[in-house]
């Protein structure tokens, strides 16, 4: 029986890692696409693009909308609330059954407590959570997209993947994560790497434009702004992840499709006035894309965001949030490789060393977290072996 549980657990964990790999590829591809239309000023509209991408989450509600239409044709009543509850509770029941039938380890990857003791979020609680995190989610993605208008994809990717560094300390402040010497050491090494990458990228861009007569002396400042925006995105991701974990606890307690669907709906309904404000003050003049290439890129990027965020949520359920966050550091060499291949960029020794430090810091943090996860898994397994016979009696 134990062997079957372990085999099933390994299969689900492997599936989670495969989905994480897909997320990594899609996120880097999305960064290159956005950078492509920002770099040549063909359509530098970070707010509108982020608004469109986030609004695309509303398609997660389409299966429920379809069920409402079918129910209306059959009974003459729409009953939207009933269909939403069925989607929320029905998916939740299947999800919980799947976890119970495979391994108790899946429900105790982070907290070390028994997930079945926690009640699943109701429909109202899920919608409320979506409303609370809509602005924070949107702002995090906005500053990340905006950073691509000023800095390289490689630098943006490296700085964005430092989110685990901020998640660790913000989580410790909120009593969500525990600090250890290994985690602090890894975070310090990551911080040193950030300084090296930022300094190298700004210096290289500045030197290229000093040599170019038509270059702008302020370009180094723009690169620094881009790096700071990417860093701000990492901080906001850390805040978002920590607060979400504190509110939800176990990620299996929330239906991610309903959650993301209402994030998209609230974004669509409440953030459109910002487009008017940005246009009025001239910060981002509103205009729809006219170039077919830009239209295709924006559409493809919407699809990428839609698919990658679903895979990201599933990967978190199949593995653990920390595993996913640390695993996203693989985007660093992938983005750097893309810059070398597609843009023929050269990486300085300082840049490469800084990137190596950041990547190495994640291995240190991951090793420490893995040991904690193993201890929590053993505790959960022992708890399950005691509770199940008691329940049968």
From Swiss-Prot:
It is a multi-pass membrane protein. The keyword Nuclease does not apply. GO terms for cellular component: fungal-type vacuole membrane. Keywords: Membrane, Phosphoprotein, Transmembrane, Transmembrane helix, Vacuole. Residues 1-17, 68-132, 177-182, 241-257, 314-321, 367-393 are cytoplasmic. The chain crosses the membrane at residues 18-38, 47-67, 133-153, 157-176, 183-200, 220-240, 258-278, 293-313, 322-342, 346-366. The keyword Transferase does not apply. It is found in: Vacuole membrane. Present with 2010 molecules/cell in log phase SD medium. Belongs to the TPT transporter family. This is Uncharacterized vacuolar membrane protein YML018C. It comes from Saccharomyces cerevisiae (strain ATCC 204508 / S288c).
């Amino acid at each position: 029986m134990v062997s079957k549980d372990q085999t099933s657990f390994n299969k689900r964990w492997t599936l989670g890692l495969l989905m994480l790999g897909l997320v990594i590829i899609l996120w880097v591809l999305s960064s290159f696409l956005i950078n492509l239309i920002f770099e040549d000023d063909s359509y530098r509209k970070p707010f509108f693009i982020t608004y469109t991408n986030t609004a695309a989450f509303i398609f997660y509600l389409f299966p429920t909308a379809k069920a409402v239409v079918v129910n209306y044709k059959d009974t003459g009543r729409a009953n939207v609330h009933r269909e939403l509850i069925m989607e929320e509770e029905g998916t939740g029941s299947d999800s919980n059954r799947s976890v119970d039938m495979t391994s108790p380890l899946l429900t105790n990857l982070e907290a070390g407590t028994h997930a079945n003791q926690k009640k699943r979020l109701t429909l109202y609680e899920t919608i409320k959570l979506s409303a609370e995190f809509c602005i924070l989610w949107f702002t995090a993605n906005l500053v990340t997209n905006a950073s691509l208008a000023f800095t390289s994809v490689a630098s943006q990717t490296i700085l964005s993947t430092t989110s685990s560094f901020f998640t660790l300390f913000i989580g410790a402040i909120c009593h969500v994560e525990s600090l250890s010497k290994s985690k602090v050491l890894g975070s310090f090494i990551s911080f040193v790497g950030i300084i090296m990458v930022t300094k190298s990228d700004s210096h290289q861009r500045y030197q290229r434009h000093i040599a170019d007569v038509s270059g702008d002396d302020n370009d180094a400042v723009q690169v620094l702004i881009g790096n700071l925006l990417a860093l701000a995105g990492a901080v906001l991701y850390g805040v978002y992840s920590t607060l979400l974990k504190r509110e939800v606890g176990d990620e299996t307690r929330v239906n991610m499709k309903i959650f993301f669907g209402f994030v998209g709906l609230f974004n669509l309904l409440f953030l459109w006035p910002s487009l008017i404000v940005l246009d009025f003050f001239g910060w981002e003049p509103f205009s729809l894309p006219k170039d077919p290439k830009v239209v295709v890129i924006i559409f493809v990027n919407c699809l990428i965001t839609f698919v990658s965020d679903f895979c990201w949520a599933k990967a978190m359920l199949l593995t653990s949030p920390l595993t996913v966050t640390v695993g996203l550091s693989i985007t660093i060499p992938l983005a750097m490789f893309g810059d070398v291949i597609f843009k023929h960029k050269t990486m300085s020794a300082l840049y490469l060393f800084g990137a190596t430090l950041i990547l190495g810091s994640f291995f240190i943090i991951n090793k420490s977290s893995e040991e904690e996860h193993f201890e929590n898994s053993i505790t959960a397994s022992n708890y399950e072996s005691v509770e199940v016979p008691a329940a049968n009696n």
